[in-house]
Amino acid sequence: MSPKTETKASVGFKAGVKEYKLTYYTPEYETKDTDILAAFRVTPQPGVPPEEAGAAVAAESSTGTWTTVWTDGLTSLDRYKGRCYHIEPVPGEESQFIAYVAYPLDLFEEGSVTNMFTSIVGNVFGFKALRALRLEDLRIPTAYVKTFQGPPHGIQVERDKLNKYGRPLLGCTIKPKLGLSAKNYGRAVYECLRGGLDFTKDDENVNSQPFMRWRDRFLFCAEALYKAQAETGEIKGHYLNATAGTCEEMMKRAIFARELGVPIVMHDYLTGGFTANTSLAHYCRDNGLLLHIHRAMHAVIDRQKNHGIHFRVLAKALRMSGGDHIHSGTVVGKLEGERDITLGFVDLLRDDFIEKDRSRGIYFTQDWVSLPGVLPVASGGIHVWHMPALTEIFGDDSVLQFGGGTLGHPWGNAPGAVANRVALEACVQARNEGRDLASQGNEIIREASKWSPELAAACEVWKEIKFEFKAVDTL
């Protein structure tokens, strides 16, 4: 090769392995408004300095590989590389550190949660230099937020569609989740809706099984909600689960739901995948369907304190990918959820602007600009005695979903729905009158049960039921 045609890469190239921190640990770096910022909980292997571990995360999730390569000279690594710009120890934990990494926006495809996660968490979690790694939070810059459609409709549009204001919405997951015929399933839906619930729900694993094919379920559920609407004068919905084995089949189910005129469909966004979810969210906006999101499989990813991805990151990703509701934990029921941490990501779902607040696990200030909000869904092991706490914790912009807490009523589904609706209305009225739900909640429920035999029966059945376990997800 003559000197005239010699490439930059062949000048000064030296093969071999060098420490990541020499290139990717840059404590002097000042982050840009356009950077995606990540907070990783890093547990290095014994003998690995935290700076090297943090730099390795930055390298392996951006431009780096295990050895020096001559093609590095063909591009500007300083422009494209991730940078570990700050490391701090985790209080009370041995050999755990929070490593802050900044990624240039050019590393990511516009409007693609799939590509964002493939880059940031795709390969680095199996890295040998780390004993464990957890992505605690992401700061999504407004320049990147604006490339996403986000939720199909958002909180205000949903309330306008349903004509329901000033209170949380009420739902119920139909049980048993598997085994019912389509007609019996539709009957259970009708009983719940006519009793006063706003929504009923397919469970996450109800797709199209031999005992109940999806088309039969959609037809009987549509009949049930139209009948309940006619009797109550309220708009009703059933989350018809469109999740399927292929994107084409998923879209076929969503199209059929739209043809039936129902207001809402459902998707399991983690098992279904972000590409499928974003496609469905776009269809729902274009065709006036609300989209309920179930987070099946989330605990596989987020339950371990030192490894995986925290749910606040999955919640942010869902808001970008698209969904009008998402399950968020209850704080008081049978499923995981510590109060301050749960409310931290509930605010990340609902609000336009969220300040950094480490006491709630929020590592970065997040500005969602014009992206619509998502309603958090409290579901799992809750019943009428929990209603005051749920109303106080989650406020009006939420969905409170009682499965067993409706269908387990001794008199049947409709009385179970009546009990929940009466309890909710009593709590909202008491709150509006200035009463303290936290201290007077049980008294409020007892007062309401005096004029509602359905609520009185529910109070008697569930008076001793508690789920008292220490939360795993702590700061």
From Swiss-Prot:
Gene3D superfamilies linked to this entry: Ribulose bisphosphate carboxylase, large subunit, C-terminal domain, RuBisCO large subunit, N-terminal domain
Additional detail: The basic functional RuBisCO is composed of a large chain homodimer in a 'head-to-tail' conformation. In form I RuBisCO this homodimer is arranged in a barrel-like tetramer with the small subunits forming a tetrameric 'cap' on each end of the 'barrel'.
Function description: RuBisCO catalyzes two reactions: the carboxylation of D-ribulose 1,5-bisphosphate, the primary event in carbon dioxide fixation, as well as the oxidative fragmentation of the pentose substrate in the photorespiration process. Both reactions occur simultaneously and in competition at the same active site.
Cofactor binding note of this UniProt entry: Binds 1 Mg(2+) ion per subunit.
Residues modified to N-acetylproline: 3
Name this polypeptide is given: Ribulose bisphosphate carboxylase large chain
PANTHER family assigned to the protein according to its UniProt record, in alphabetical order: RIBULOSE BISPHOSPHATE CARBOXYLASE (PTHR42704), RIBULOSE BISPHOSPHATE CARBOXYLASE LARGE CHAIN (PTHR42704:SF15)
Modified residues (N6,N6,N6-trimethyllysine): 14
Biological processes annotated in GO: photorespiration; reductive pentose-phosphate cycle
Organism: Magnolia macrophylla
Family annotation (CDD domains): RuBisCO_large_I (cd08212)
Entry's localization field: Plastid, Chloroplast
Active site feature: 175, 294
Protein keywords: Acetylation, Calvin cycle, Carbon dioxide fixation, Chloroplast, Disulfide bond, Lyase, Magnesium, Metal-binding, Methylation, Monooxygenase, Oxidoreductase, Photorespiration, Photosynthesis, Plastid
Catalytic reactions of this protein: 2 (2R)-3-phosphoglycerate + 2 H(+) = D-ribulose 1,5-bisphosphate + CO2 + H2O; D-ribulose 1,5-bisphosphate + O2 = 2-phosphoglycolate + (2R)-3-phosphoglycerate + 2 H(+)
Subunit structure: Heterohexadecamer of 8 large chains and 8 small chains; disulfide-linked. The disulfide link is formed within the large subunit homodimers.
Family listed: Belongs to the RuBisCO large chain family. Type I subfamily.
PTM annotation (N6-carboxylysine): residues: 201
Molecular function GO labels: magnesium ion binding; monooxygenase activity; ribulose-bisphosphate carboxylase activity
Superkingdom in the source lineage: Eukaryota
SUPFAM superfamilies linked: RuBisCo, C-terminal domain (SSF51649), RuBisCO, large subunit, small (N-terminal) domain (SSF54966)
UniProt EC number: 4.1.1.39
GO cellular component, one term: chloroplast
Site (Transition state stabilizer): 334
Predominant location category: plastid
NCBIfam families: PRK04208.1 (NF003252)
One Pfam family named in its UniProt record: RuBisCO_large
